Structure formats: C-alpha cells, structure tokens
C-alpha cells in the first residue's frame, strides 16, 4: 500500500513538472514577443516621416547674397519679417549681419513695429536699433515714396507676412512699391512667405470700378497666393499702373505647398492675434462696412459679432479702447450677438468665405439700407453681394454667383504659382 502511494506521487510530480515547464515556456515566449513588438513599434515611430519645416525666403541667404552684395538696399517690412528657429531675429538684422548695405526701411500699414490702428497715420522715423531711416508709406495721402527717398537705394527688398485676402493691404503696398521701382528703374526682390489661407480660393473677382485702398487688383477675395506669386502675376499680367514691368526676383520658400497649414509666428496686425481670427477674416471682415462690431476692442477681434440692438442672443461683449483699436465701433456699448471664437479651425476653413454671419446680422437688425455703408461694396468687390442680401437671398445663392470667377482666376493664376496646389 505504501509503495503504491509513493508510485502515484512520483507520477503526479512528473506531470506537475511538465505543466510548470510548459507554462514557463509560454511566459518567456510571450514576454519575448511583447518586447520584440515594443522594439518594432519604437523603430517604426523613429522612422515615421516628419514634415520638413518651412524655410521662408529671408532665411535662404545663399539664394540672394550674391544678388544684393554691393547694392544699396531699401527694405519694405514690418514686425512679421522674422527669421530663425525661434523667430526672434528680424530680417533687417540678418541682412546687416551678412554685410548687406540697407540704407532705407519702408513701413506699411500699422507701421514697422505693427502697433498702429488700421489706416492710422504713421510718421516717418528712425529705427532705434540700427539708426536706419524709416520712410512710412502711411504718413500722408500718397502711398508712393518721394524721388529724394528713391535716390537712396538701388534695389527694394520686400519681406512681409500676408494673409491672402484682397482687402488686406500689405500686397497693395508691395504693388505700389513695384510701380515706384519700375518708374525709377530699381530692382525688386521678394523674400517670400507662406500664405496661411493659401489652401483657399473664394469670392468674386474685383470689379475694377470699385478699386480702392482695400481692393487693388482684379483677383478673387481669397486669392490663395503668396506675396511672391502676387508679384509675379502683377508683373506678368501688366497690372502695374505705369504699364511697365519691374526687374523682379522672388526668393521662394522651401518645403511649402498651398495645402500646408502654416502657423504664423507673429501676429500680422493688431487685430489678427491668432490663427482662428485669420481663418475667419474672409467672412467677418464684411462687418467693417456695417454698424455691427466684429470684436475690435475685445480679446476676440474678427471672432465675434454683435450690436446693441441685436436681439435673441445669449452672448454679449463690450468693445473698449485698447492698443490697435483706439476707437472701435460700438465702443463702450454692450453688444449682443454671436461668439465664434470656439469654432474649430478645420470647420472654418471648410466653410470658405461664409456670408451667413452678415446675413444673420442684417436680418436681425432689420434696418434696411442703413445696414450697409459705402465701404461694404469696396470690401465685397461687387455690388451684387449687397443687393442679393437686401433681396433676401441665401448665402448659398450668393456663393453660386462667383463660382465662374473662381474657376477663371484659378486658371489665370496657374502660370505664376511657385508651389504645388
């Protein structure tokens, strides 16, 4: 009996050892497989292709130093002309470090430091850091420099961040300077920068009978082009007032396409403080031609809209005087309206130029023709937008009117594009 029990125990022990061994094999194999998977995943992540950083034209010194060496240079720029990984150096400083002879600075709307209100008079001055004279192009009625100023240099270099709208004035300043360069036989160079709205072409082509300081060329409202491309098209299409062509060189960006979602390192103007304001700008800027506040004097310019007499809204705001918006529309008045500043950027981009906001305010205020100022048609570039809103048409019906313009402009601009669409 005793020997039978011992025999049975030995058999059980053998089976137990076999089971334990099998479990150990499975456990080790499992751990090895997991470790191998972790290694594979780590290698995969490390090898994942990364989008190369955009290099702006000003940073590509090898492309322009030979062109500019030994010449007297006028730089048309503002606070957006920054370079470097940290965006903490101005193009002016880089040019001086490289031994280039910058004799004059031209400043556009908002001034060289970008602090002035829209359209505000900006006096000529001297750059405190370098001692180089700054000639303001927003000092008087004329946007053209004097002969005395033009005699100070041989070549004009432009480095300004645009946002891709027909009514955003930086491209107009550039085109005026191209006219001056052509008239005085000066070279013209553009250090190109990405267009944050470069993925979009929308709106009607400007009726040139409505040409103004917020609409200068026969282009769509949202043109989707960089400053360099606009310069090439202006030259190529014969759009300069003189009818002449300027000796033009564009230093293009690197690693950029028109589908690139480029984040601006510096606000292009005081009331476009973030990317959402830039994406909403094509839609909400029309309120500049109405009594409705678009948020100037608040933390959300171009990202809210309202009026003291608008009714039925839960959101309200009060515009206040502040730097960059000294006397905003409806200042110190409680405005009722719509908050757009929490919208997703992707949704705003997908909508394109959206007239629903203006139509909503027009119908809510119900003041008829008093809703529109003469400035509205200049912004719109066509009278039919105002007329169709007054006639009760929908945003989609109005949008259908400019689709032929969009197709025409896309075809016309194609030879001048520097970057893939």
Model-inferred region functions:
Residues 211-282:
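Conserved anion/nucleotide-ligand pocket segment
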């Amino acid at each position: 009996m005793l020997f039978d029990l011992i025999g049975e125990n030995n058999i059980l022990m053998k089976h137990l050892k076999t089971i334990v061994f099998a479990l150990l094999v499975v456990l080790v194999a499992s751990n090895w497989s997991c470790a191998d998977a972790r290694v594979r995943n780590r290698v995969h992540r490390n090898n994942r292709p990364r989008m190369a950083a955009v290099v702006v034209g000003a940073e590509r010194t090898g492309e322009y130093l030979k062109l500019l060496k030994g010449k007297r240079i006028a730089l048309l720029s503002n606070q957006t002309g920054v370079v470097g990984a940290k965006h903490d150096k101005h193009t002016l400083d880089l040019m001086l470090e490289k031994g280039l002879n910058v004799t004059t600075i031209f400043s556009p709307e908002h001034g060289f430091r970008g602090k002035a209100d829209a359209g505000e008079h900006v006096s000529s001055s001297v750059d405190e850091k370098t001692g180089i004279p700054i000639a303001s192009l927003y000092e008087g009625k004329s946007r053209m420099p004097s002969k005395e100023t033009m005699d100070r240099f041989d070549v004009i270099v432009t480095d300004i961040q645009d946002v891709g709208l027909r009514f955003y004035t930086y491209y107009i300043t550039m085109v005026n300077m191209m006219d001056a360069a052509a008239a005085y036989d000066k070279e013209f160079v553009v250090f190109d920068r990405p267009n944050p709205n470069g993925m979009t072409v929308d709106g009607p082509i400007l009726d040139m009978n409505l040409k103004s300081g917020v609409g200068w060329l026969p282009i769509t409202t949202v043109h989707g082009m960089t400053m360099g491309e606009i310069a090439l098209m202006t030259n190529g299409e014969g759009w300069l007032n003189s009818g002449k062509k300027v000796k033009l060189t564009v230093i293009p960006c690197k690693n950029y396409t028109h589908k690139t979602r480029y984040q601006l390192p510096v606000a292009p103007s005081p009331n476009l403080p973030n990317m959402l304001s830039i994406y909403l700008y094509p839609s909400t800027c029309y309120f500049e031609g109405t009594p409705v506040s678009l948020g100037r004097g608040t933390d959300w310019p171009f990202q809210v809209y309202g009026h003291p007499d608008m009714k039925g809204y839960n959101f309200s705001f009060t515009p206040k005087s502040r730097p960059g918006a000294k006397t905003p529309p409806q200042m110190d008045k409680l405005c009722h309206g719509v908050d757009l500043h929490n919208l997703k950027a992707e949704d705003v981009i997908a909508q394109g130029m959206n007239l629903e906001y203006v139509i909503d305010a027009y119908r809510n205020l119900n003041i008829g023709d008093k809703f529109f100022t003469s400035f509205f048609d200049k912004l719109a570039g066509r009278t039919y937008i105002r007329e169709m809103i007054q006639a009760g048409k929908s945003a989609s019906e109005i949008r259908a009117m400019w689709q032929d313009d969009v197709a025409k402009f896309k075809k016309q601009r194609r030879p001048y594009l520097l970057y893939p669409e």
